[in-house]
């Protein structure tokens, strides 16, 4: 699963997801892509599940690119802990995704195979997505 090797700070504010994605919203590497239509936090487990589903479906053919990286730590408090006494410990990592962001790209395969593989990956995502073709 993806996570940063090291970060400057262990914990982050949650922040807000307003507006659309102005970067990472064009196809750069492959010919087909999966684009987010809603804002969400996508966990490293979800990213990995989608990647595995795509690569397993195309079977040695083509190449896939993961265009998002989980660089935000999400903290959780221990169960049955009283309020106060600081922020919880980082438990998992998420990628902040805004509408328009490209999640995965694929190349070197036929369109029908790419559409099938990307739709399987889309079912692993917690948001609505769309299949797009470059050009």
Swiss-Prot record:
UniProt GO molecular function: rRNA binding; structural constituent of ribosome
* Keywords recorded for this protein, A-Z: Chloroplast, Plastid, Ribonucleoprotein, Ribosomal protein
**InterPro entries from the entry?**
Ribosomal_uL16, Ribosomal_uL16_bact-type, Ribosomal_uL16_CS, Ribosomal_uL16_dom, Ribosomal_uL16_sf
Q: Which GO terms describe its biological process?
A: mitochondrial translation
The record ties this protein, via Gene3D superfamilies, to: Ribosomal protein L10e/L16
Q: What is its main location?
A: plastid
Any one GO cellular component localisation term in the record: mitochondrial large ribosomal subunit
- Protein's cellular compartments: Plastid, Chloroplast
Q: How does it assemble?
A: Part of the 50S ribosomal subunit.
Q: Which family does it belong to?
A: Belongs to the universal ribosomal protein uL16 family.
Q: What is this protein called?
A: Large ribosomal subunit protein uL16c
Query: Which species does this protein come from?
Result: Oenothera argillicola (Appalachian evening primrose)
Taxonomy of origin reads:
Eukaryota, Viridiplantae, Streptophyta, Embryophyta, Tracheophyta
The gene designation is rpl16
């Amino acid at each position: 699963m993806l996570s940063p090797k090291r970060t400057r700070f262990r914990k982050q504010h949650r922040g807000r997801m307003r507006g659309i994605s102005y970067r990472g919203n064009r196809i750069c590497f492959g010919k087909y892509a999966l684009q987010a239509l809603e804002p969400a936090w996508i966990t490293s487990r979800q990213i990995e599940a989608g990647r595995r589903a795509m690569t397993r479906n195309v079977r040695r053919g083509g190449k896939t690119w993961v265009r998002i990286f989980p660089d935000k730590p999400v903290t959780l408090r221990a169960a049955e802990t009283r309020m106060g006494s600081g922020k919880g410990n980082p438990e998992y990592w998420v990628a902040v995704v805004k509408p328009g962001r490209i999640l995965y790209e694929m190349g070197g395969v036929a369109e029908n195979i790419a559409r099938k593989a990307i739709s399987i990956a889309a079912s692993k995502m917690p948001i609505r997505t769309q299949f797009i073709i470059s050009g």
